Amino acid sequence: VGTLYAGEAEFEESCEAIKAQEQVDFTHHVIADLPEYEAHNELWNAWGKVKASYDIFVKVDADTILNRNEALSDIYKLFQQPRVTGVQIKLHDYFSDQLISGLNAFSTEVQFKNSKKRLFADHADRNHDLVIKGEDVSHLAPIGWHCKYPAARQAYHYGLRRALKKQSDIVRRCASMWLKYRDDARAWALTGAMEAGWIYRNQFNYSDERFEKSLNDYQNDSERLIKVENYANMVTS
């Protein structure tokens, strides 16, 4: 089980949920406090060095909490089908209040090559035979919670990245949920989304100077929620 950690509020509970998994033997490997692209590449390299000793690799992000003690066992059973090399099972996402594609697992047949795009660092797996997802694994969804307790910094990062990736449906859904509930976390996610632009295409890590300055500026902006409301109404109209 591989996890990338960069200050996510759910990390401790995520680790506890992994530790509580039953009916499987596993190792939990955590890579902390690296930029997203470098962290992913380090994770692929770490897996490549040890995969001969394991059956599958499951990536559980630090903002993801498995919601039952048999989650890893359920995933493992899917790989008993000989052709299956990849599995993707949906998570319940706090921001959009819906199921989203999220948790991924891989057989040892899969190879990882560093992505050419920093924004899509996780698009690195290849040499698949059969990947099962969607309706084929809907009986296991949701397998966990995504961003269950997001802090402001984390929420801002979520919105910025979703908008940079042009995931307009997720942003629109988040805006609809904020207009309904008026919660602080979704407001920060929308703040990040409305800030997204080409100058952030390589400046979306927590440690990036532009990211930090933008977040600080908004924390001191007394009109931020007015801007968020205008943005939310625009993207949902």
Mark where each language-model region is:
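Active-site nucleotide-sugar/metal-binding loop of Leloir-type enzymes
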Residues: 41-56
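Short, acidic, metal-binding catalytic loop of nucleotide-sugar glycosyltransferases
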Residues: 13-25
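Short beta-strand-to-loop acidic/aromatic patch adjacent to the donor-nucleotide binding site
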Residues: 53-65
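Short beta-strand-to-loop element that shapes/binds the nucleotide-sugar donor at the catalytic cleft/hinge
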Residues: 86-102
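Acidic donor-binding/catalytic loop of UDP-sugar-dependent glycosyltransferases
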Residues: 62-77
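C-terminal catalytic/acceptor-binding lobe
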Residues: 137-237
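A short, glycine-/small-residue-rich helix N-cap motif at loop->alpha-helix starts
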Residues: 34-41
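A conserved hydrophobic helix/loop-capping motif in glycosyltransferases and polysaccharide synthases
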Residues: 1-7
